[in-house]
Amino acid sequence: MSDLKAAALRALKLMDLTTLNDNDTDEAVIALCKNAKTAVGNTAAVCIYPRFIPIAKKTLREQGTPEVRIATVTNFPHGNDDIEIAVAETKAAVAYGADEVDVVFPYRALIAGDETTGFELVKQCKEACGDVLLKVIIETGELKEEALIKKASQICIEAGANFIKTSTGKVPVNATPEYARMMLEVIRDMDVAKTVGFKPAGGVRTAEDAQAYLAMADEILGDDWADNMHYRFGASSLLTNLLNTLEVTEETADPSAY
């Protein structure tokens, strides 16, 4: 198997296959769940709005892939600084049956110099999650500066985040290799690689993209680190392109897709 094919297969099994469109329907979510099961293995998770968790759970169970995890989003995509609402949404997501919650960090508060709100929001959302995995979206494309991206990553980790995630996919600039490197370096420098994972989201579209991101993780945190409890790709169109690289399909995805 070529290096690119090996990377494509590895990336496929690390995907949070995502649909977070305002016009999502039960049918769209059922189709997403069916796509999570492929001839070469399953994606790690599907990522959907909370109201679709029951239909996703049913579909995954009926198709014989109950191990595909269900991720959902809270405080999304705005990243407001109302802790009470973020916690209430997170509790509701857990009650719906989410295995993982991706919450948006109050990044505008941090830009304005407020570090406390973000810490408290993440801490209380993690308490609401219990054993449910909490991924925190710091919105790198809005923070922009290395100092802010590293500070947000540190705050999330100190407050108990299980993963730090680049982006919502709803702003002009989402994951980039530069932002990924900054966040991975924080995980390394804080010596939390055993307990904290990383998720680039939005902008990872091809097998070559995924290969480059995984090579970076291997370089910074070691070859065995990026397993499905420490690394995820948040994407939708990536799956079609990975399957194309693996010669399972001849399709390629719309280059503008998430």
UniProtKB/Swiss-Prot annotation:
Protein keywords:
Cytoplasm, Lyase, Schiff base
Reactions accelerated catalytically: 2-deoxy-D-ribose 5-phosphate = D-glyceraldehyde 3-phosphate + acetaldehyde
Q: Organism, per UniProt?
A: Aliivibrio fischeri (strain MJ11) (Vibrio fischeri)
Family according to the record: Belongs to the DeoC/FbaB aldolase family. DeoC type 2 subfamily.
Q: What are the positions of the active site?
A: 102, 165, 199
Q: Which interval of the chain is the signal sequence?
A: none
Q: What are the leading ranks of the lineage?
A: Bacteria, Pseudomonadati, Pseudomonadota, Gammaproteobacteria, Vibrionales
- Organism's domain of life? Bacteria
Among the GO biological process terms of this entry, one is: carbohydrate catabolic process
Q: Which InterPro entries match?
A: Aldolase_TIM, DeoC, DeoC/FbaB/LacD_aldolase, DeoC_typeII
Please describe what this protein does.
Answer: Catalyzes a reversible aldol reaction between acetaldehyde and D-glyceraldehyde 3-phosphate to generate 2-deoxy-D-ribose 5-phosphate.
Q: What is its main location?
A: cytoplasm
Tell me one GO molecular function of this protein: deoxyribose-phosphate aldolase activity
Query: Localized where?
Result: Cytoplasm
Q: Which SUPFAM superfamilies match?
A: Aldolase
What is this protein identified as? Deoxyribose-phosphate aldolase
Q: Which GO terms describe its cellular component?
A: cytoplasm
Pathway given in the UniProt record? Carbohydrate degradation; 2-deoxy-D-ribose 1-phosphate degradation; D-glyceraldehyde 3-phosphate and acetaldehyde from 2-deoxy-alpha-D-ribose 1-phosphate: step 2/2
Q: What is its EC number?
A: 4.1.2.4
